[in-house]
A protein has these predicted regions:
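Bacterial N-terminal signal peptides
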Residues: 9-20
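Sec/Tat signal peptide C-region and signal peptidase I cleavage site
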Residues: 20-26
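Accessory alpha-helical/coil subdomains and C-terminal extensions
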Residues: 28-30, 35-39, 57, 63-68, ...
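Short, acidic/small-residue loops that bind anionic groups at enzyme active sites
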Residues: 124-155, 162-165, 283-293
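Internal gly/pro-rich beta-alpha loop/helix module
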Residues: 140-210
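ATP/nucleoside-binding phosphotransfer catalytic cores, i.e., glycine-rich phosphate-binding loops
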Residues: 273-352
Length: 352
């Protein structure tokens, strides 16, 4: 080759590199954002404590999945790097605003939120209730940290991006996708402390799955609603019903500033006599009480007419959470209680 042409070609390569040049096909690839929040998917084993600790940034996570470059351009947004047992109402509004901001970019096809599995069901539901974009948002995590040889994080990340790019991915709301299974945020729950097959949707079933050659959507969640994000989230306490309880925890919550109380009740939504009296005490003080069931499947319903039965609790002014878990009944209360504390109006949000 002519030395001048060779020099020009070399200079062109140098300039392309200095300007952030990429392979020609990259310009044709869609862009997916990864909003990283931390926890197991971003943890590695500490050599001193021999326990997993936060270690990986969002860039580190995406770099661990080389195949991502073949299907998408990835924009990383590091929101936090914390265990998900630190995640809650103090951080959820900022996370929702950040994800909404990222989704507003016309170049972004969708968002993957990396998160710990302990509170993933609640964070995803909060996002589902507050995000207004119809672009796909897929929340993922890992049951095995990045130091383990069979860590599930990279596969879950790749599957999430594939899901976002799939046909018909829009309009599904926030989903939780781990171990190939796609769950709706409203219905998903964690069922095992360590198994990678930990998330399912109970009676509602999976939305679909991410297979080797395609993404399959089998159904769509119809029970979705969007609520405004208030300037301040209220304090919502949660109290468990257990045999022999005297109801003092409900009374304490009512007297110490709780703006609503979720009761994790038995069966269809039943409590003992002492708890009944405590619930009525809170309601009489103008504090909404939401009855949810601790049972894995089924709904909390006002059925039984003896004292402490659901029928009597409803007549006392309680709201019933239907098939929402106690945790998710609380998430919905965070957004619905600032709008209304009136029984029928509040009940309408749980019936949607």
């Amino acid at each position: 080759m002519n030395p001048l042409r060779l020099q020009a070609a070399f200079l062109g390569l140098v300039l392309a590199g200095s300007l952030g040049g990429s392979p020609s096909h990259a310009a044709d690839l869609p862009t997916v954002a990864v909003v990283a929040t931390g926890c197991t998917i971003a943890m590695k084993q500490d050599p001193v404590t021999h326990a997993p600790v936060p270690a990986l940034s969002g860039e580190d996570l995406t770099a661990s999945v080389p195949k991502l470059k073949e299907i998408a351009n990835v924009k990383v947004v590091d929101f936090s790097n914390i265990p998900s047992y630190y995640m809650g109402p103090d951080r959820w509004p900022a996370l929702a605003r950040k994800v909404e901001e990222v989704l507003a970019d016309p170049a972004i096809a969708g968002v993957v939120v990396t998160h710990g599995t302990d509170t993933l069901d609640q964070t995803s539901y909060f996002l589902d209730l507050t995000l207004r974009s119809d672009k796909p948002v897929v929340a993922i995590g890992a049951q095995r940290n990045a130091s383990e040889w069979d860590t599930d994080g990279p596969r879950n990340l790749l599957n999430a991006v594939r899901q976002i790019l799939a046909e018909d991915a829009k309009g599904k709301g926030v989903t939780v996708t781990l171990n190939h299974r796609i769950n709706a945020a409203r219905e998903v729950r964690k069922t095992h402390t360590s198994n990678v097959e930990t998330f399912n949707s109970g009676d509602a079933g999976f939305l679909g799955y991410v297979d080797e050659d395609r993404v399959v959507f089998s159904r769509q969640s119809l029970r979705r609603q969007t609520l405004p994000l208030p300037d301040r989230l209220p304090r919502i306490d949660m109290v468990a019903m257990y045999p022999g309880t005297d109801g003092s925890q409900v009374r304490q919550a009512a007297d110490s500033g709780a703006e609503a109380i979720v009761v994790e009740a038995l069966g269809w939504g039943n409590v003992n006599e002492a708890m009944h009296d405590a619930i009525k005490y809170a309601i009489d003080k103008g504090i909404p009480v939401i009855i949810a069931t601790k049972v894995y499947n089924g709904r909390a319903l006002p059925i039984y007419g003896s004292k402490g039965g659901g029928n009597m609790l409803q007549k006392a002014g309680a709201v019933f959470a239907g098939d929402l878990t106690p945790d998710k009944a609380r998430v919905l209360a965070l957004l619905a209680v600032p709008i209304t504390k009136e029984q029928k109006a509040l009940q309408a949000y749980y019936d949607k």
